């Protein structure tokens, strides 16, 4: 009887896995809704209890997400992000140097802030620089997006995928990654990607004749009304929060708690209002995380993960080629659509 139930659970879990992969690729419905359909379905089918299906809502990584959304909102809403972006003006000497400056700054910012928010801030900054310096703006917009995506792999908080992987490691009792563990690969990847675009990739970027940009992107928002002290508080809170996360083990304070100390300072001092803080929380990212975590839990509990692992071992042999395993992993990881968030 136990074996029959196990086979049933594996079949149901694999069915939802295939469903998630297909729906993530087709995007016929929002990714976050797909993830929650999976979580609810795994509970209704009996694979997971309600507590297991929705425990992601109280996961420490979700708590961390929420706090970082608030800190990031202060960084963007006070205009600090635009001030940082304007630093690129100093490097607007030629096309190659400008691409390097834009991509490195965008990548580093997206390593700690919302990738979408970073790109949204950098686009009008770069359009303004191109207009002033006589550069073709179409050469620089795509590198911004790629840099934001690559920069998300610099730190633990750079991308939801990083947090999902870390949560699954903790769930399996395998420990957790350090704050900059991803950066050991992510930072070199950002540097190499930047150099590629600066010296080779730029030749393949479209050269569309420059035309008058949309008024919404022609200039930055006006932050002159924002008190200077708010900018200082927003910047210092972000820097100190990141520092606390880096030295998590030394100070004995978890990432989530450090982030919430910063978020509370932001709201308590009035840098942004309570309503602005609440609006900054991206529920789509939260729901995507919760649903993905539920699927990961089901893969372990049902034995579906072990089943897939055994199939791969049987196909590749007891001592599979590491390159073959890497190819299988990359194929699996590139099936779902990865969003910049």
Predicted regions and their residues:
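Helix-loop interface residues and adjacent transmembrane-helix termini in multi-pass membrane transporters
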Residues: 25-28, 93, 134, 176
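Inter-helical loop and helix-membrane interface segments of multi-pass membrane transporters/permeases
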Residues: 166-177, 248-251, 310-317
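Membrane-embedded alpha-helical segments and adjacent helix-loop junctions characteristic
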Residues: 33, 40, 44-138, 280-285, ...
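Juxtamembrane and boundary regions of transmembrane helices in multi-pass small-molecule transporters
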Residues: 6, 12, 97, 132-146, ...
């Amino acid at each position: 009887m136990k074996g029959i139930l196990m086979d049933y659970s594996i079949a149901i879990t694999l069915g939802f896995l295939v469903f998630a992969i297909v729906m993530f690729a087709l995007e016929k419905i929002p990714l976050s809704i797909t993830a929650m359909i999976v979580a609810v379905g795994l509970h209704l089918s009996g694979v997971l209890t309600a507590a297991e299906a929705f425990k992601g809502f109280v996961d420490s990584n979700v708590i961390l997400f929420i706090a970082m959304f608030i800190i990031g909102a202060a960084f963007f809403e006070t205009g600090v992000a635009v001030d940082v972006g304007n630093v690129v003006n100093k490097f607007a000497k030629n096309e190659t140097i400008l691409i390097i400056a834009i991509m490195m700054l965008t990548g580093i910012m997206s390593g700690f802030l919302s990738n979408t928010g970073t790109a949204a801030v950098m686009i009008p900054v770069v359009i303004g620089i191109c207009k002033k310096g006589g550069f073709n703006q179409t050469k620089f917009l795509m590198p911004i997006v790629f840099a934001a995506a690559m920069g998300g792999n610099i730190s633990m908080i750079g991308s939801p995928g990083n947090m999902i992987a870390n949560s699954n490691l903790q769930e399996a009792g395998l420990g957790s990654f350090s704050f900059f563990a991803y950066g050991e690969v992510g930072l070199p990847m950002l540097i190499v990607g930047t150099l590629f675009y600066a010296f080779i990739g730029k030749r393949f970027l479209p050269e569309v004749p420059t035309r008058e940009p949309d008024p919404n992107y022609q200039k930055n928002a006006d932050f002159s009304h924002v008190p200077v002290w708010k900018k200082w508080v927003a910047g210092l809170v972000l820097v100190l929060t990141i520092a606390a996360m880096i030295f998590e083990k030394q100070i004995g304070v978890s990432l989530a708690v450090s982030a919430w100390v910063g978020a509370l300072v932001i709201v308590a001092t009035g840098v942004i209002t309570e309503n602005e803080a609440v609006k900054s929380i991206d529920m789509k990212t939260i729901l995507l995380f919760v649903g993905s975590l539920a699927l990961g839990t089901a893969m372990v509990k049902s034995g579906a993960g072990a089943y897939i692992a055994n199939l791969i071992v049987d196909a590749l042999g007891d001592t599979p080629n590491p390159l073959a395993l890497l190819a299988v992993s990359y194929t699996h990881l590139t099936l779902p659509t990865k969003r910049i968030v």
